């Protein structure tokens, strides 16, 4: 009788132990119930800056941040490949909203708008600051324009419009990144197509390619080339130039008369393993602490309580903004990139 009781007790104990271990393992694997655990953070933005954002979040909140850095198009392709078993939780950055808009119908971004941005209109001052269905929200403002080397170009001689780049005096002195690889350059191409029409747009880029001495794959490379004197003019975002200037390089920036001014967004990854942690990370990016890090890297913060460290603010640049036809972008994003490859590579 005693042996039988011992046997039953042992069986019940073992069963309870197995159930407990299984439950614990499930909690550790998901990390999604309370936001604790690892948060996988996909970003093409400056690796050191993105790492700093992750570290600051870890200081302030539970959970660890695993930063996964790659180019925008590489990350989008990765999320598409992982669609049936998502590995990321948050996707931040891609040279503005266009890659995010193109990704909405791909089923790789989920719906989440932080409380901080819930009262924003979808479009503020002519700039789309969040997705109408909550698929992304802007965390900073990017201005596409011209970096120039102040030792090689006088301020009053620097180009002020996109047509100025075709001036013969800049032949062999301009760099812009490769639209087949760079989200920054894709924005440049799509904008010109929308403003000029496709026939005139392709003619414009045929001339611009002849002006360039290089088309590197990285969106930041033309500005770095300007800082080293390898180019007089480089097409890029504002923060790229001001970051170089802050390092003591001979670089300044021109906001063209009419140019893309857009937010750089963040999205929750659809079906990611730690959605609650991902939401907390997005909240952090819009908080004063997160926005201050972006400002320290010379990005224009979207939170009005954080001061820009560059001469530019949303208020100062909004009059330069062009109207971007987002529906046209969604319909033509991949096609225009492929046509660029066929025409110029």
Give the predicted meaning of each segment.
Residues 43-51, 70, 87-230:
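Extracytoplasmic ligand-binding site segments that recognize negatively charged/polar headgroups
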Residues 97-102, 227, 231-250:
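A ligand-binding cleft/hinge motif common to bilobed small-molecule-binding domains
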Residues 142, 172-177, 204-209, 215-216, 247-270, 285-308, ...:
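Periplasmic-binding protein-like
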Residues 25-26, 33-101:
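Early extracytoplasmic/lumenal segment of secretory-pathway proteins
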Residues 311-345:
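Extracellular/periplasmic bilobal clamshell ligand-binding domains
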Residues 145-152, 190, 263-275, 285, ...:
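A bilobed periplasmic-binding-protein/Venus flytrap-type ligand-binding module shared by bacterial periplasmic
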Residues 1-39:
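Short, low-complexity disordered leader/linker segments with a strong preference
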């Amino acid at each position: 009788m005693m042996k039988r009781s011992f046997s039953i007790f042992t069986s019940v104990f073992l069963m309870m132990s197995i159930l407990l271990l299984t439950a614990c393992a499930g909690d550790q694997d998901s990390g999604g119930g309370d936001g604790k655990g690892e948060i996988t953070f996909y970003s093409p933005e400056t690796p050191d800056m993105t790492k700093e954002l992750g570290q600051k979040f870890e200081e302030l909140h539970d959970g660890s941040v695993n930063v996964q850095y790659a180019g925008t198009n590489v990350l989008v392709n990765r999320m598409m490949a992982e669609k049936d078993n998502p590995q990321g939780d948050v996707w931040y950055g891609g040279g503005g909203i266009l890659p995010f808009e193109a990704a909405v119908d791909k089923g790789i971004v989920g719906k989440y708008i932080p409380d901080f941005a819930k009262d924003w209109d979808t479009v503020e001052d002519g700039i789309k600051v969040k997705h109408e269905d909550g698929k992304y929200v802007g965390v900073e403002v990017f201005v596409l324009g011209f970096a120039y080397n102040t030792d090689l170009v006088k301020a009053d001689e620097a180009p002020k419009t996109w047509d100025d780049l075709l001036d013969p005096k800049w032949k062999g002195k301009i760099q812009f990144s490769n639209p087949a690889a760079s989200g920054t350059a894709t924005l440049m191409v799509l904008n010109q197509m929308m403003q000029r029409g496709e026939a005139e747009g392709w003619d414009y880029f045929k001339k611009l390619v002849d002006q360039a001495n290089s088309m590197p794959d990285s969106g930041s490379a033309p500005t770095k080339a300007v800082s080293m004197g390898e180019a007089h003019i480089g097409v890029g975002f504002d923060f790229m130039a001001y970051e170089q200037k802050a390092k003591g390089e001979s670089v300044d920036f021109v906001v063209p008369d009419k140019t893309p001014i857009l937010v750089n967004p963040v999205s929750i990854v659809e079906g990611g393993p730690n959605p609650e942690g991902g939401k907390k990370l997005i909240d952090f990016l819009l908080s004063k602490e997160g926005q201050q890090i972006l400002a320290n890297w010379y990005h224009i913060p979207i939170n009005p309580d954080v001061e820009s460290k560059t001469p530019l603010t949303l208020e100062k640049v909004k009059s330069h903004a062009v109207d971007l036809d987002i529906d046209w972008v969604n319909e033509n994003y991949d096609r225009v990139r492929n046509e660029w490859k066929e025409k110029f590579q």
